[in-house]
Amino acid sequence: MASASSGPAAAGFSPLDSGVPAGTAASGIKRGTVSEGPYASLMPVKKIGHRSVDSSGETTYKKTTSSALKGAIQLGITHTVGSLSTKPERDVLMQDFYVVESIFFPSEGSNLTPAHHYNDFRFKTYAPVAFRYFRELFGIRPDDYLYSLCSEPLIELSNSGASGSLFYVSSDDEFIIKTVQHKEAEFLQKLLPGYYMNLNQNPRTLLPKFYGLYCVQAGGKNIRIVVMNNLLPRSVKMHMKYDLKGSTYKRRASQKEREKTLPTFKDLDFLQDIPDGLFLDADMYSALCKTLQRDCLVLQSFKIMDYSLLMSIHNMDHAQREPMNSETQYSIDTRRPAPQKALYSTAMESIQGEARRGGTVETEDHMGGIPARNNKGERLLLYIGIIDILQSYRFVKKLEHSWKALVHDGDTVSVHRPGFYAERFQRFMCNTVFKKIPLKPSPTKKFRSGPSFSRRSGPSGNSCTPSQPTASGEHKAQVTTKAEVEPDIHLGRPDVLPQTPPLEEISEGSPVPGPSFSPAVGQPLQILNLSSTLEKLDVAESELTH
Protein backbone atom coordinates (compact mmCIF):
# COMPACT_ATOMS: atom_id res chain seq x y z
CA MET A 1 0.00 0.00 0.00
CA ALA A 2 1.39 3.39 -0.93
CA SER A 3 1.54 6.15 1.58
CA ALA A 4 1.09 9.82 0.84
CA SER A 5 1.32 12.71 3.23
CA SER A 6 1.74 16.45 3.31
CA GLY A 7 1.99 19.17 5.89
CA PRO A 8 4.05 22.09 7.11
CA ALA A 9 7.61 21.27 8.02
CA ALA A 10 8.72 21.74 11.58
CA ALA A 11 11.26 24.36 12.55
CA GLY A 12 14.66 23.59 11.15
CA PHE A 13 13.16 21.99 8.03
CA SER A 14 13.57 18.48 9.40
CA PRO A 15 11.48 16.86 6.65
CA LEU A 16 14.52 17.07 4.41
CA ASP A 17 15.96 14.21 6.44
CA SER A 18 12.78 12.52 7.62
CA GLY A 19 10.63 9.89 5.95
CA VAL A 20 10.56 6.18 5.40
CA PRO A 21 13.78 4.89 3.81
CA ALA A 22 13.30 3.66 0.27
CA GLY A 23 14.09 0.06 1.18
CA THR A 24 11.36 -0.02 3.84
CA ALA A 25 7.68 -0.55 3.12
CA ALA A 26 4.92 1.26 4.97
CA SER A 27 4.63 -1.75 7.25
CA GLY A 28 8.27 -1.41 8.26
CA ILE A 29 9.34 -4.66 6.56
CA LYS A 30 12.65 -4.43 4.75
CA ARG A 31 12.06 -4.93 1.03
CA GLY A 32 15.61 -5.24 -0.25
CA THR A 33 19.19 -4.10 0.11
CA VAL A 34 21.18 -1.60 -1.87
CA SER A 35 23.02 -4.45 -3.59
CA GLU A 36 19.89 -5.48 -5.50
CA GLY A 37 18.59 -4.40 -8.90
CA PRO A 38 19.55 -0.96 -10.22
CA TYR A 39 21.37 0.01 -7.02
CA ALA A 40 24.07 -2.59 -7.65
CA SER A 41 27.27 -1.28 -9.17
CA LEU A 42 30.79 -2.33 -9.96
CA MET A 43 33.80 -0.91 -8.18
CA PRO A 44 33.95 2.83 -8.92
CA VAL A 45 36.83 3.92 -11.10
CA LYS A 46 36.14 7.66 -10.76
CA LYS A 47 34.48 9.43 -7.84
CA ILE A 48 33.77 13.11 -7.19
CA GLY A 49 31.67 13.80 -4.13
CA HIS A 50 28.63 11.52 -4.24
CA ARG A 51 28.98 10.96 -7.99
CA SER A 52 30.93 7.95 -9.22
CA VAL A 53 31.45 6.13 -12.51
CA ASP A 54 32.17 2.39 -12.52
CA SER A 55 34.27 0.41 -14.98
CA SER A 56 31.27 -0.18 -17.25
CA GLY A 57 30.69 3.57 -17.60
CA GLU A 58 27.52 3.57 -15.46
CA THR A 59 27.08 6.71 -13.35
CA THR A 60 25.85 6.31 -9.79
CA TYR A 61 24.88 8.92 -7.21
CA LYS A 62 24.71 7.87 -3.57
CA LYS A 63 24.72 4.22 -4.75
CA THR A 64 21.71 4.76 -7.03
CA THR A 65 22.29 4.33 -10.75
CA SER A 66 21.64 7.31 -12.96
CA SER A 67 19.04 5.41 -14.98
CA ALA A 68 17.10 4.50 -11.82
CA LEU A 69 17.30 8.08 -10.55
CA LYS A 70 16.01 9.50 -13.84
CA GLY A 71 13.10 7.07 -13.81
CA ALA A 72 12.22 7.90 -10.20
CA ILE A 73 12.33 11.64 -10.93
CA GLN A 74 9.97 11.33 -13.87
CA LEU A 75 7.53 9.08 -11.99
CA GLY A 76 7.53 11.45 -9.01
CA ILE A 77 7.07 14.66 -11.00
CA THR A 78 4.29 13.10 -13.07
CA HIS A 79 2.39 12.20 -9.90
CA THR A 80 2.93 15.44 -7.99
CA VAL A 81 2.07 17.78 -10.89
CA GLY A 82 -0.97 15.69 -11.76
CA SER A 83 -2.29 15.68 -8.21
CA LEU A 84 -1.64 19.41 -7.86
CA SER A 85 -3.72 20.17 -10.95
CA THR A 86 -6.81 18.84 -9.15
CA LYS A 87 -6.43 21.48 -6.43
CA PRO A 88 -8.02 24.89 -7.02
CA GLU A 89 -5.71 27.81 -7.67
CA ARG A 90 -5.40 30.38 -4.91
CA ASP A 91 -3.04 32.99 -3.55
CA VAL A 92 0.21 31.79 -2.03
CA LEU A 93 0.13 31.79 1.78
CA MET A 94 3.10 31.89 4.13
CA GLN A 95 2.62 28.29 5.24
CA ASP A 96 2.78 27.15 1.61
CA PHE A 97 6.53 27.69 1.63
CA TYR A 98 6.99 25.02 4.31
CA VAL A 99 4.66 22.27 3.05
CA VAL A 100 6.25 18.92 2.16
CA GLU A 101 4.25 16.25 0.32
CA SER A 102 5.46 12.64 0.29
CA ILE A 103 4.39 9.62 -1.78
CA PHE A 104 5.75 6.05 -1.64
CA PHE A 105 6.35 4.16 -4.91
CA PRO A 106 6.52 0.37 -4.39
CA SER A 107 7.86 -1.49 -7.41
CA GLU A 108 4.66 -3.57 -7.72
CA GLY A 109 2.54 -0.42 -7.85
CA SER A 110 -0.46 0.62 -5.75
CA ASN A 111 -3.81 2.31 -6.02
CA LEU A 112 -1.98 5.67 -6.16
CA THR A 113 1.18 4.83 -8.11
CA PRO A 114 2.02 2.75 -11.19
CA ALA A 115 4.20 -0.37 -11.17
CA HIS A 116 7.81 0.14 -12.20
CA HIS A 117 11.01 -1.88 -12.62
CA TYR A 118 13.09 0.13 -10.13
CA ASN A 119 13.54 -0.59 -6.45
CA ASP A 120 11.01 0.96 -4.06
CA PHE A 121 11.51 4.67 -3.45
CA ARG A 122 9.81 7.62 -1.78
CA PHE A 123 9.34 10.95 -3.55
CA LYS A 124 9.01 14.28 -1.72
CA THR A 125 7.81 17.58 -3.13
CA TYR A 126 8.68 20.82 -1.33
CA ALA A 127 6.36 23.85 -1.39
CA PRO A 128 4.27 22.54 -4.32
CA VAL A 129 1.80 25.46 -4.32
CA ALA A 130 4.58 28.07 -4.18
CA PHE A 131 6.53 26.46 -7.02
CA ARG A 132 3.33 26.19 -9.07
CA TYR A 133 3.06 29.96 -8.74
CA PHE A 134 6.70 30.40 -9.84
CA ARG A 135 6.08 28.27 -12.94
CA GLU A 136 2.93 30.22 -13.79
CA LEU A 137 4.82 33.49 -13.37
CA PHE A 138 7.24 32.34 -16.08
CA GLY A 139 4.42 31.16 -18.34
CA ILE A 140 5.02 27.42 -17.83
CA ARG A 141 1.77 25.48 -18.04
CA PRO A 142 1.46 22.18 -16.12
CA ASP A 143 1.10 20.10 -19.30
CA ASP A 144 4.19 21.73 -20.85
CA TYR A 145 6.18 21.16 -17.65
CA LEU A 146 5.22 17.47 -17.67
CA TYR A 147 5.80 17.10 -21.40
CA SER A 148 9.29 18.62 -21.21
CA LEU A 149 10.44 16.59 -18.21
CA CYS A 150 8.56 13.32 -18.47
CA SER A 151 7.61 12.52 -22.08
CA GLU A 152 11.12 11.38 -23.06
CA PRO A 153 14.19 10.18 -21.10
CA LEU A 154 16.24 12.88 -19.43
CA ILE A 155 19.68 13.51 -20.92
CA GLU A 156 22.63 13.28 -18.56
CA LEU A 157 25.30 15.94 -19.00
CA SER A 158 28.83 14.59 -18.80
CA ASN A 159 30.45 17.90 -17.81
CA SER A 160 29.40 17.79 -14.15
CA GLY A 161 30.31 20.36 -11.55
CA ALA A 162 33.37 20.26 -9.33
CA SER A 163 31.12 19.37 -6.38
CA GLY A 164 30.18 16.07 -7.99
CA SER A 165 26.60 17.06 -8.74
CA LEU A 166 24.59 15.28 -11.41
CA PHE A 167 23.06 17.37 -14.19
CA TYR A 168 20.22 16.35 -16.47
CA VAL A 169 18.63 18.35 -19.28
CA SER A 170 15.14 17.86 -20.67
CA SER A 171 14.90 16.56 -24.24
CA ASP A 172 13.56 19.92 -25.45
CA ASP A 173 16.47 21.82 -23.86
CA GLU A 174 14.13 23.83 -21.64
CA PHE A 175 15.00 22.65 -18.10
CA ILE A 176 18.05 21.59 -16.11
CA ILE A 177 17.78 19.16 -13.19
CA LYS A 178 20.64 19.32 -10.70
CA THR A 179 21.34 17.32 -7.55
CA VAL A 180 21.98 19.55 -4.54
CA GLN A 181 23.29 18.92 -1.06
CA HIS A 182 21.15 18.98 2.07
CA LYS A 183 22.31 22.44 3.18
CA GLU A 184 21.63 23.87 -0.26
CA ALA A 185 18.10 22.46 -0.37
CA GLU A 186 17.48 23.71 3.17
CA PHE A 187 18.73 27.18 2.28
CA LEU A 188 16.54 27.30 -0.83
CA GLN A 189 13.53 26.58 1.37
CA LYS A 190 14.45 29.50 3.61
CA LEU A 191 14.94 31.71 0.56
CA LEU A 192 11.54 30.98 -0.95
CA PRO A 193 9.51 33.79 0.73
CA GLY A 194 12.07 36.41 -0.29
CA TYR A 195 12.47 34.78 -3.70
CA TYR A 196 8.69 35.02 -4.14
CA MET A 197 8.74 38.73 -3.28
CA ASN A 198 11.64 39.44 -5.64
CA LEU A 199 10.04 37.63 -8.59
CA ASN A 200 6.80 39.53 -8.06
CA GLN A 201 8.70 42.80 -8.29
CA ASN A 202 11.06 41.79 -11.09
CA PRO A 203 10.63 38.56 -13.07
CA ARG A 204 13.41 39.67 -15.43
CA THR A 205 16.56 38.60 -13.65
CA LEU A 206 19.86 36.80 -14.23
CA LEU A 207 19.39 34.89 -10.98
CA PRO A 208 18.55 31.17 -11.24
CA LYS A 209 14.89 30.50 -11.95
CA PHE A 210 13.76 27.65 -9.71
CA TYR A 211 10.78 25.64 -10.92
CA GLY A 212 10.72 22.80 -8.40
CA LEU A 213 12.48 21.23 -5.39
CA TYR A 214 12.20 17.48 -4.84
CA CYS A 215 13.81 14.60 -2.95
CA VAL A 216 14.16 10.94 -3.99
CA GLN A 217 14.72 8.57 -1.07
CA ALA A 218 16.32 5.49 -2.61
CA GLY A 219 18.62 2.83 -1.23
CA GLY A 220 18.42 4.42 2.22
CA LYS A 221 19.80 7.74 0.87
CA ASN A 222 18.24 11.16 0.28
CA ILE A 223 18.87 12.56 -3.21
CA ARG A 224 17.68 16.17 -3.45
CA ILE A 225 17.15 17.77 -6.83
CA VAL A 226 16.17 21.20 -8.11
CA VAL A 227 14.63 22.04 -11.50
CA MET A 228 15.95 25.26 -13.06
CA ASN A 229 16.06 27.13 -16.35
CA ASN A 230 18.65 25.95 -18.86
CA LEU A 231 21.19 28.71 -19.51
CA LEU A 232 23.11 26.95 -22.28
CA PRO A 233 21.02 25.56 -25.15
CA ARG A 234 22.50 22.44 -26.74
CA SER A 235 21.26 23.62 -30.14
CA VAL A 236 23.89 26.38 -30.14
CA LYS A 237 27.59 25.54 -30.51
CA MET A 238 29.54 27.15 -27.67
CA HIS A 239 33.14 28.11 -28.39
CA MET A 240 34.23 29.41 -24.96
CA LYS A 241 32.88 29.18 -21.42
CA TYR A 242 33.84 31.17 -18.32
CA ASP A 243 33.00 31.10 -14.62
CA LEU A 244 33.69 34.62 -13.33
CA LYS A 245 33.69 35.99 -9.77
CA GLY A 246 35.77 39.16 -9.95
CA SER A 247 38.53 37.52 -7.93
CA THR A 248 42.08 36.61 -8.94
CA TYR A 249 43.20 34.28 -6.15
CA LYS A 250 43.41 30.73 -7.56
CA ARG A 251 41.07 31.73 -10.36
CA ARG A 252 42.65 29.84 -13.25
CA ALA A 253 41.31 26.65 -14.81
CA SER A 254 43.23 23.52 -13.85
CA GLN A 255 45.09 21.44 -16.39
CA LYS A 256 42.51 18.70 -15.97
CA GLU A 257 39.70 21.14 -16.74
CA ARG A 258 41.51 22.38 -19.85
CA GLU A 259 41.54 18.87 -21.28
CA LYS A 260 37.73 18.80 -21.50
CA THR A 261 35.90 19.33 -24.78
CA LEU A 262 34.45 22.63 -23.53
CA PRO A 263 36.54 23.72 -20.52
CA THR A 264 35.16 26.18 -17.99
CA PHE A 265 37.79 28.89 -17.71
CA LYS A 266 38.04 31.42 -14.89
CA ASP A 267 38.87 35.07 -14.20
CA LEU A 268 42.62 34.94 -14.86
CA ASP A 269 42.02 33.02 -18.07
CA PHE A 270 39.54 35.67 -19.22
CA LEU A 271 41.97 38.51 -18.49
CA GLN A 272 44.60 36.71 -20.55
CA ASP A 273 42.34 35.55 -23.39
CA ILE A 274 40.13 38.65 -23.76
CA PRO A 275 42.07 41.52 -22.10
CA ASP A 276 40.04 44.19 -23.89
CA GLY A 277 36.71 42.76 -22.76
CA LEU A 278 33.52 42.15 -24.73
CA PHE A 279 31.84 45.10 -26.44
CA LEU A 280 28.07 45.71 -26.30
CA ASP A 281 26.06 48.55 -27.76
CA ALA A 282 25.20 51.30 -25.30
CA ASP A 283 21.60 50.27 -24.60
CA MET A 284 22.50 46.61 -24.13
CA TYR A 285 25.42 47.49 -21.86
CA SER A 286 23.24 49.74 -19.70
CA ALA A 287 20.48 47.13 -19.42
CA LEU A 288 22.94 44.39 -18.50
CA CYS A 289 24.70 46.43 -15.82
CA LYS A 290 21.41 47.57 -14.29
CA THR A 291 20.23 43.97 -14.13
CA LEU A 292 23.48 42.87 -12.48
CA GLN A 293 23.23 45.74 -10.00
CA ARG A 294 19.66 44.82 -9.07
CA ASP A 295 20.44 41.10 -8.75
CA CYS A 296 23.51 41.74 -6.61
CA LEU A 297 21.40 43.87 -4.28
CA VAL A 298 19.01 40.94 -3.83
CA LEU A 299 21.88 38.54 -3.11
CA GLN A 300 23.42 41.04 -0.70
CA SER A 301 20.13 41.30 1.19
CA PHE A 302 20.26 37.53 1.77
CA LYS A 303 23.94 37.76 2.79
CA ILE A 304 24.86 35.50 -0.11
CA MET A 305 28.42 35.44 -1.43
CA ASP A 306 30.70 33.33 -3.62
CA TYR A 307 28.31 33.34 -6.58
CA SER A 308 29.58 33.44 -10.16
CA LEU A 309 28.59 34.67 -13.58
CA LEU A 310 28.48 31.74 -15.98
CA MET A 311 29.10 32.96 -19.52
CA SER A 312 29.22 30.88 -22.69
CA ILE A 313 30.25 32.48 -25.96
CA HIS A 314 29.03 31.52 -29.42
CA ASN A 315 31.25 33.03 -32.12
CA MET A 316 28.97 33.58 -35.12
CA ASP A 317 31.85 34.22 -37.51
CA HIS A 318 33.65 31.03 -36.46
CA ALA A 319 30.42 29.06 -36.72
CA GLN A 320 29.95 30.14 -40.33
CA ARG A 321 33.37 28.72 -41.20
CA GLU A 322 32.85 25.44 -39.34
CA PRO A 323 31.51 22.38 -41.17
CA MET A 324 28.06 21.24 -40.15
CA ASN A 325 28.29 17.81 -38.53
CA SER A 326 26.77 15.81 -35.72
CA GLU A 327 29.62 16.61 -33.34
CA THR A 328 29.20 20.36 -33.50
CA GLN A 329 25.45 20.63 -33.97
CA TYR A 330 22.67 19.30 -31.82
CA SER A 331 19.23 18.81 -33.27
CA ILE A 332 15.98 19.10 -31.40
CA ASP A 333 13.21 16.81 -32.63
CA THR A 334 11.05 19.13 -34.73
CA ARG A 335 8.36 16.48 -35.15
CA ARG A 336 7.30 16.98 -31.56
CA PRO A 337 4.88 19.81 -30.81
CA ALA A 338 6.89 22.64 -29.34
CA PRO A 339 5.90 23.44 -25.75
CA GLN A 340 5.37 26.97 -24.50
CA LYS A 341 8.77 28.52 -23.90
CA ALA A 342 9.29 29.87 -20.40
CA LEU A 343 9.10 33.64 -20.16
CA TYR A 344 12.32 35.55 -19.40
CA SER A 345 14.24 32.27 -19.82
CA THR A 346 16.97 33.56 -22.14
CA ALA A 347 19.82 35.94 -21.40
CA MET A 348 18.38 38.52 -23.78
CA GLU A 349 14.93 38.47 -22.18
CA SER A 350 16.44 38.64 -18.69
CA ILE A 351 18.07 42.03 -19.21
CA GLN A 352 15.66 43.83 -21.51
CA GLY A 353 13.16 44.86 -18.84
CA GLU A 354 10.16 46.85 -19.90
CA ALA A 355 12.14 49.31 -22.00
CA ARG A 356 11.89 49.41 -25.74
CA ARG A 357 14.44 47.21 -27.45
CA GLY A 358 15.45 49.62 -30.15
CA GLY A 359 15.54 48.92 -33.85
CA THR A 360 18.79 46.99 -34.12
CA VAL A 361 18.19 44.07 -31.77
CA GLU A 362 15.76 41.27 -32.44
CA THR A 363 15.87 38.31 -30.08
CA GLU A 364 14.63 35.77 -32.60
CA ASP A 365 17.69 36.41 -34.78
CA HIS A 366 20.10 35.80 -31.91
CA MET A 367 18.73 32.55 -30.46
CA GLY A 368 18.27 34.11 -27.03
CA GLY A 369 21.88 35.27 -26.77
CA ILE A 370 23.14 38.80 -26.13
CA PRO A 371 24.90 40.21 -29.23
CA ALA A 372 28.44 41.43 -28.64
CA ARG A 373 31.80 41.81 -30.37
CA ASN A 374 35.39 41.15 -29.40
CA ASN A 375 38.34 43.40 -30.15
CA LYS A 376 38.71 41.74 -33.57
CA GLY A 377 35.21 42.82 -34.49
CA GLU A 378 33.91 39.25 -34.57
CA ARG A 379 30.20 38.83 -33.89
CA LEU A 380 29.41 36.97 -30.67
CA LEU A 381 26.36 35.73 -28.82
CA LEU A 382 26.63 35.67 -25.02
CA TYR A 383 24.65 33.29 -22.82
CA ILE A 384 24.95 34.39 -19.21
CA GLY A 385 23.42 33.84 -15.80
CA ILE A 386 24.32 34.07 -12.11
CA ILE A 387 24.95 30.63 -10.59
CA ASP A 388 25.94 29.01 -7.29
CA ILE A 389 23.74 31.18 -5.09
CA LEU A 390 23.02 28.18 -2.83
CA GLN A 391 26.56 26.89 -2.37
CA SER A 392 27.63 30.14 -0.74
CA TYR A 393 25.43 29.52 2.29
CA ARG A 394 27.79 26.85 3.63
CA PHE A 395 30.69 29.28 3.41
CA VAL A 396 28.73 31.99 5.20
CA LYS A 397 27.95 29.58 8.04
CA LYS A 398 31.66 28.78 8.39
CA LEU A 399 32.45 32.48 8.66
CA GLU A 400 29.81 33.34 11.25
CA HIS A 401 32.04 32.36 14.17
CA SER A 402 34.85 34.55 12.79
CA TRP A 403 33.05 37.88 12.33
CA LYS A 404 34.78 39.54 15.31
CA ALA A 405 38.19 38.52 13.98
CA LEU A 406 37.67 40.17 10.62
CA VAL A 407 39.01 43.63 9.79
CA HIS A 408 36.46 46.43 10.00
CA ASP A 409 38.18 48.72 7.53
CA GLY A 410 35.87 49.98 4.81
CA ASP A 411 37.89 48.51 1.93
CA THR A 412 38.63 45.13 3.50
CA VAL A 413 36.77 42.18 4.91
CA SER A 414 34.15 43.31 7.42
CA VAL A 415 30.71 42.52 8.73
CA HIS A 416 29.47 44.13 5.51
CA ARG A 417 31.23 41.42 3.55
CA PRO A 418 28.27 40.54 1.24
CA GLY A 419 28.18 44.17 0.11
CA PHE A 420 31.91 44.13 -0.58
CA TYR A 421 31.57 40.95 -2.65
CA ALA A 422 28.63 42.40 -4.61
CA GLU A 423 30.47 45.67 -5.31
CA ARG A 424 33.60 43.86 -6.49
CA PHE A 425 31.50 41.53 -8.65
CA GLN A 426 29.71 44.44 -10.34
CA ARG A 427 32.92 46.40 -10.88
CA PHE A 428 34.64 43.48 -12.55
CA MET A 429 31.70 42.65 -14.81
CA CYS A 430 30.84 46.20 -15.91
CA ASN A 431 34.37 47.63 -16.13
CA THR A 432 36.47 44.67 -17.24
CA VAL A 433 34.32 41.94 -18.76
CA PHE A 434 31.73 44.06 -20.55
CA LYS A 435 32.51 47.32 -22.34
CA LYS A 436 30.31 49.86 -24.08
CA ILE A 437 30.76 50.50 -27.78
CA PRO A 438 31.21 54.29 -28.21
CA LEU A 439 28.21 56.05 -29.68
CA LYS A 440 28.49 57.88 -32.96
CA PRO A 441 29.48 61.51 -32.25
CA SER A 442 26.85 64.17 -32.78
CA PRO A 443 27.54 67.07 -35.20
CA THR A 444 28.04 69.45 -32.25
CA LYS A 445 30.66 67.20 -30.72
CA LYS A 446 32.38 66.83 -34.09
CA PHE A 447 32.71 70.60 -34.33
CA ARG A 448 34.18 70.88 -30.83
CA SER A 449 36.52 67.91 -30.95
CA GLY A 450 37.56 67.82 -34.58
CA PRO A 451 36.52 65.57 -37.43
CA SER A 452 38.57 62.49 -36.58
CA PHE A 453 39.26 62.17 -32.87
CA SER A 454 37.40 62.21 -29.58
CA ARG A 455 38.26 64.79 -26.92
CA ARG A 456 40.22 62.43 -24.66
CA SER A 457 43.62 61.49 -26.02
CA GLY A 458 46.83 60.03 -24.76
CA PRO A 459 50.18 61.78 -24.34
CA SER A 460 51.07 61.10 -27.95
CA GLY A 461 47.95 62.89 -29.12
CA ASN A 462 46.33 59.76 -30.46
CA SER A 463 42.79 59.13 -29.38
CA CYS A 464 41.72 55.89 -27.76
CA THR A 465 38.54 55.78 -29.83
CA PRO A 466 39.05 57.51 -33.19
CA SER A 467 36.12 58.06 -35.52
CA GLN A 468 37.33 57.95 -39.11
CA PRO A 469 35.27 59.51 -41.90
CA THR A 470 34.01 57.26 -44.67
CA ALA A 471 33.86 58.12 -48.36
CA SER A 472 30.36 59.48 -47.90
CA GLY A 473 31.49 61.82 -45.17
CA GLU A 474 29.65 59.98 -42.41
CA HIS A 475 31.47 59.05 -39.23
CA LYS A 476 31.39 55.51 -37.91
CA ALA A 477 32.49 54.72 -34.35
CA GLN A 478 35.10 51.98 -34.21
CA VAL A 479 36.42 49.92 -31.34
CA THR A 480 40.17 50.49 -31.17
CA THR A 481 42.15 48.77 -28.47
CA LYS A 482 45.40 49.83 -26.87
CA ALA A 483 47.00 46.74 -28.35
CA GLU A 484 46.26 48.18 -31.81
CA VAL A 485 47.62 51.62 -30.93
CA GLU A 486 50.72 50.49 -29.06
CA PRO A 487 51.51 46.81 -29.72
CA ASP A 488 54.27 46.82 -27.11
CA ILE A 489 51.80 47.26 -24.26
CA HIS A 490 51.11 43.83 -22.79
CA LEU A 491 47.44 43.56 -21.81
CA GLY A 492 47.47 39.88 -20.94
CA ARG A 493 48.83 40.19 -17.41
CA PRO A 494 46.56 38.02 -15.29
CA ASP A 495 47.32 39.83 -12.05
CA VAL A 496 46.23 43.28 -13.24
CA LEU A 497 42.75 44.74 -13.57
CA PRO A 498 41.82 48.06 -15.25
CA GLN A 499 41.74 51.14 -13.08
CA THR A 500 38.37 51.87 -11.48
CA PRO A 501 37.25 54.79 -9.32
CA PRO A 502 36.99 54.47 -5.52
CA LEU A 503 33.73 53.20 -4.09
CA GLU A 504 32.77 56.56 -2.66
CA GLU A 505 32.88 58.24 -6.09
CA ILE A 506 29.90 56.22 -7.28
CA SER A 507 26.66 57.59 -5.88
CA GLU A 508 24.22 55.11 -4.45
CA GLY A 509 21.72 53.84 -6.99
CA SER A 510 23.72 55.03 -10.00
CA PRO A 511 24.75 52.52 -12.66
CA VAL A 512 28.24 51.10 -12.49
CA PRO A 513 30.66 53.26 -14.50
CA GLY A 514 31.44 52.15 -18.01
CA PRO A 515 34.81 51.59 -19.61
CA SER A 516 35.46 55.33 -19.89
CA PHE A 517 37.45 54.97 -16.68
CA SER A 518 40.11 52.96 -18.50
CA PRO A 519 43.57 54.61 -18.50
CA ALA A 520 44.54 56.66 -21.51
CA VAL A 521 46.92 55.36 -24.14
CA GLY A 522 50.52 55.48 -23.04
CA GLN A 523 49.71 55.09 -19.37
CA PRO A 524 50.52 51.70 -17.80
CA LEU A 525 47.61 49.72 -16.47
CA GLN A 526 47.19 50.23 -12.75
CA ILE A 527 46.27 47.64 -10.20
CA LEU A 528 42.67 47.84 -9.01
CA ASN A 529 42.31 49.94 -5.86
CA LEU A 530 41.00 46.91 -4.01
CA SER A 531 43.49 44.37 -5.38
CA SER A 532 45.54 44.11 -2.18
CA THR A 533 42.36 43.77 -0.18
CA LEU A 534 41.09 41.22 -2.70
CA GLU A 535 44.19 39.08 -2.19
CA LYS A 536 43.80 39.22 1.61
CA LEU A 537 40.14 38.39 1.25
CA ASP A 538 40.76 35.37 -0.96
CA VAL A 539 43.54 34.07 1.30
CA ALA A 540 41.13 34.34 4.26
CA GLU A 541 38.50 32.47 2.27
CA SER A 542 40.95 29.70 1.44
CA GLU A 543 42.08 29.31 5.05
CA LEU A 544 38.53 29.22 6.41
CA THR A 545 37.27 26.69 3.88
CA HIS A 546 40.10 24.20 4.49
Curated annotation (Swiss-Prot):
Annotated catalysed reactions: a 1,2-diacyl-sn-glycero-3-phospho-(1D-myo-inositol 4-phosphate) + ATP = a 1,2-diacyl-sn-glycero-3-phospho-(1D-myo-inositol-4,5-bisphosphate) + ADP + H(+); 1-octadecanoyl-2-(5Z,8Z,11Z,14Z)-eicosatetraenoyl-sn-glycero-3-phospho-1D-myo-inositol 4-phosphate + ATP = 1-octadecanoyl-2-(5Z,8Z,11Z,14Z)-eicosatetraenoyl-sn-glycero-3-phospho-1D-myo-inositol 4,5-bisphosphate + ADP + H(+); 1,2-dihexadecanoyl-sn-glycero-3-phospho-(1D-myo-inositol-4-phosphate) + ATP = 1,2-dihexadecanoyl-sn-glycero-3-phospho-(1D-myo-inositol-4,5-bisphosphate) + ADP + H(+); 1-octadecanoyl-2-(9Z)-octadecenoyl-sn-glycero-3-phospho-1D-myo-inositol 4-phosphate + ATP = 1-octadecanoyl-2-(9Z)-octadecenoyl-sn-glycero-3-phospho-1D-myo-inositol 4,5-bisphosphate + ADP + H(+)
Spans annotated as Disordered: 441-522
GO BP term, example: protein localization to plasma membrane
Compositionally biased spans, kind Basic and acidic residues: 473-493
Source organism, top-level taxon: Eukaryota
GO cellular component, one term: cytosol
Stretches assigned to the PIPK domain: 65-433
Stored SMART domains: PIPKc
Sequence ranges of Low complexity compositional bias: 449-461
PROSITE patterns hit by this protein: PIPK (PS51455)
Record has S-adenosyl-L-methionine as a keyword: no
GO MF: 1-phosphatidylinositol-4-phosphate 5-kinase activity; ATP binding; kinase binding
Keywords carried by this UniProt record: ATP-binding, Cell membrane, Cell projection, Cytoplasm, Isopeptide bond, Kinase, Lipid metabolism, Membrane, Nucleotide-binding, Nucleus, Transferase, Ubl conjugation
Biased composition (Polar residues): 462-471
EC number(s) per entry: 2.7.1.68
Enzyme class name: transferase
Subunit structure and binding partners: Interacts with RAC1. Interacts with TUT1. Forms a complex with CDH1/E-cadherin, CTNNB1/beta-catenin and CTNND1 at the plasma membrane upon calcium stimulation. Found in a ternary complex with IRS1 and DGKZ in the absence of insulin stimulation. Interacts with DGKZ. Interacts with PIP4K2C; the interaction inhibits PIP5K1A kinase activity.
Purpose: Catalyzes the phosphorylation of phosphatidylinositol 4-phosphate (PtdIns(4)P/PI4P) to form phosphatidylinositol 4,5-bisphosphate (PtdIns(4,5)P2/PIP2), a lipid second messenger that regulates several cellular processes such as signal transduction, vesicle trafficking, actin cytoskeleton dynamics, cell adhesion, and cell motility. PtdIns(4,5)P2 can directly act as a second messenger or can be utilized as a precursor to generate other second messengers: inositol 1,4,5-trisphosphate (IP3), diacylglycerol (DAG) or phosphatidylinositol-3,4,5-trisphosphate (PtdIns(3,4,5)P3/PIP3).
Name the record gives this protein: Phosphatidylinositol 4-phosphate 5-kinase type-1 alpha
Lineage, uppermost ranks: Eukaryota, Metazoa, Chordata, Craniata, Vertebrata
